[in-house]
Amino acid sequence: MVDENTQDNAPEQEEEAAIVQAGPVSSWLTENGFDHDLLEPDHLGVELIKVSPDFLVPLCTALYAYGFNYLQCQGAYDLGPGKELVSFYHLIKVSDNCEQAEEVRIKVFLPRDNPHIPSVYWIWKAADWQERESYDMYGIIYDGHPDLKRILMPEDWVGWPLRKDYVSPDFYELQDAY
């Protein structure tokens, strides 16, 4: 026998489950007037925050001042052919006598035809080679980076090899080049 109340409340329960609760970092950003969107936390419960490219540097500067002094990882990925590219930043608050470090991941969604984003090198020097790798593999241009050039591929390489719409050069073309 099916309980009618359970059936009637199913859409409401789905809506409540779809609402992402603001975590401590997002709440702090909202209290201080920083525009951002919440994404669902990852499988470890790390807060995910979406921000537009224009607000990346002000938001990251605020997070640095708030104590997120360690850029653990910067990377990028492709959502698929014709879809957006994503640049992400995994930040950690490192402090003395901390039992559990606070973490947050910032994501910036970029159009694949013009993937420009400001560099965070001037906030976290660890972004240097990580942004270069994202540029080299996905073609994301980090405006203001002091030395944005290829880091893994030869400098004369054509294209962005980790984009999902990348067409690999023929093996023999590569072999003949050397």
From Swiss-Prot:
It is found in: Cellular thylakoid membrane. GO terms for biological process: photosynthesis, light reaction. GO terms for molecular function: NADH dehydrogenase (ubiquinone) activity; quinone binding. The keyword Protein biosynthesis does not apply. It catalyses: a plastoquinone + NADH + (n+1) H(+)(in) = a plastoquinol + NAD(+) + n H(+)(out); a plastoquinone + NADPH + (n+1) H(+)(in) = a plastoquinol + NADP(+) + n H(+)(out). The keyword Cell inner membrane does not apply. NDH-1 can be composed of about 15 different subunits; different subcomplexes with different compositions have been identified which probably have different functions. This is NAD(P)H-quinone oxidoreductase subunit J. It comes from Crocosphaera subtropica (strain ATCC 51142 / BH68).
